Amino acid sequence: MTNYLLEIGLEEIPAHLVTPSINQLAERMEAFLNENRLKFDKIIKFSTPRRLALIVEELSDSSEAIDEEVKGPSAKIAKDAEGNWSKAIQGFSRGQGATPDDLILKGDYYYAKKHVDGVKSEEILSKVGDEVIAKMTFSTYMKWGNNDFLFVRPIQWIVSLLEDEIVAFDLLDVTANRFSRGHRFLANVEIELKNANDYASKMPENFVLVDAEHRKAEISAQILALASENNWQVTLHKDLLEEVNNIVEYPTAFVGSFDPKYLSVPAEVLVTSMRDNQRYFEVYNQEGQLAPNFISVRNGNAEHIENVVLGNEKVLFARLEDAEFFWKEDQKLKIEDLVAKLAKVTFHAKIGSITEHMARTKLIAAKLADIAGLTDEEKVDVARSAEIYKFDLLTGMVGEFDELQGVMGEKYALLAGENANVAAAIREHYMPTSADGQLPETKVGSVLAAADKIDSVLSFFNVGLIPSGSNDPYALRRAVQGLIRIIEKMNWHFDLSLFIDQFEGQNHAEILEFVKARVQKLLLEKLDRYDIVEAAINSSNFDITNMMESAFVIDGHKLHEPFKPAIENVSRSINLVKKAADIAEINPALFEEDTEQALYDAVISLQNQWTYKPCEEKFRAIVHMLAPAIEAFFDNVMVMAEDLAVRDNRIALLSEVVALTSVMADFSLINTK
């Protein structure tokens, strides 16, 4: 058993590509080793902005020898009319190093038994360049030199060591060897690695912390230490910490400051300038107030750190000057003037202006406000917020810091005298901004956010701008996922198709399937029964909250004893009704058996307020009241009676059963085997 080191040295990789790149390299290496039957214990990952590296631990000296059967020609073409071996069978056996008589007939085909010897690990690993590195894919590529090879960034060097032996291969003009490189500025020299096992200890000596998790821990410790020394509070934002970790090889944290006068600008603006634009960690005093300081991390040691501090402060000064200017100038603007100008701002060339988008959103929001049971005052706030909620797009601050759209809208709205509900809705209508992002907290904001997303999705689908594959340039999947989460949180019950049907366009079915796919995705993140999820999302109305609740309720009962017979009896009813060409009106006078009347009575008793019953109550009624009546009906009644009137009447009765149960789910899609 030996250890193998692979290091790919590169020009600086963009921070957001470092982690996915090293993960992909490890996955491809694992697949490559498995395909070549080369056993190993584990793969350890290392990454910095300039290198992607792996150590494969306890690698076998050679691949496993195996005996395998290779499928050959069909028996139908194995021999000619005289019973002689055909050319096809002779060619196959020759290719396998055998004779036709050595072949085995299994079923309709001939097979050759073949012994495959193990291959030395060195020979297998010499293919890593072509079979692992060259096959990597990236969202962003570069091409260099006079070749068509594409990679995330130009390759500068490759280390390939099996213990102390070089496993040589060429990739373009780079030959794998044992020489790595140190830090670009602190140790810009070749580093000879005598053994693969020296990598983790040798690189830090040359100012490269190759272990990404160790480097991240070091950054965290340094930041927390500086905060403690200065009696500050600091949050190690996960995404920011990940980004900073992927732009440095040898981190040194430092403290910077800015003029306290800028604290008159909203904290969100200052934080955006520091965190999002400059990758600084903002700090707070012990009262939780933003301090005129920041903590940043350089890619290097503490030498001449004072110059680094001054340089960073100078860059931040320019940004804060702009922010202060926009903050003062924007307050001179009137909301109504900005709203009027939105008529000349394009939402999308095929859809129209932002003003038109806002007008449609206002109509949708009014209907949602009724559904949500908002008070008259809240409905007034919904209408007002829908009239103005995009005005901040034309402010100087949002023009400079587009991350602050909505945030600045709230602040400027409050300064202009709008009430807190309207102002909050302006900020909240963008929520959630990510798959698990924060949801609106106010009712008015929830209605506006949902309405805005509904109109966006319907508008883009209406003009044929529909996401396909991974291509979703207008973030419609995120919009729908956010819409679903808002509806679920607010516990709104309404049929989404009512909004879609009132919208012009021919893509209604596609929209429903698109939304359904997002509901399915969210449910499958929490439930493991695909069939139950499918049943729930294929209920007879498009009530998203009902879909979600139904899936969880049904899943919660799947192990209960009555579950299987109940589902089977309802499914049988569904399948019989599906086969019927027409459904007649129920005529109780045509009932011939008591079980028909009993089932009819059960249906009638449940129909009252059925739609508004909680899903748990619905399912219990189906299992304990309706299903036993269905079972007794099937046990005592021949549905397909010779008398057509009686047959149609029984189908009609079952159709009422289906109408009831399908409000919750299509139970015929649930597997009970």
Curated annotation (Swiss-Prot):
The gene is glyS. It is found in: Cytoplasm. It catalyses: tRNA(Gly) + glycine + ATP = glycyl-tRNA(Gly) + AMP + diphosphate. It comes from the Bacteria. Belongs to the class-II aminoacyl-tRNA synthetase family. It comes from Lactococcus lactis subsp. cremoris (strain MG1363). InterPro entries: Gly-tRNA-synth_bsu, Gly-tRNA-synth_heterodimer. Its main location: cytoplasm. This is Glycine--tRNA ligase beta subunit. Keywords: Aminoacyl-tRNA synthetase, ATP-binding, Cytoplasm, Ligase, Nucleotide-binding, Protein biosynthesis. GO terms for biological process: glycyl-tRNA aminoacylation. Pfam families: tRNA_synt_2f. It is an enzyme of class 6 (ligase). GO terms for cellular component: cytosol. The keyword Iron does not apply.
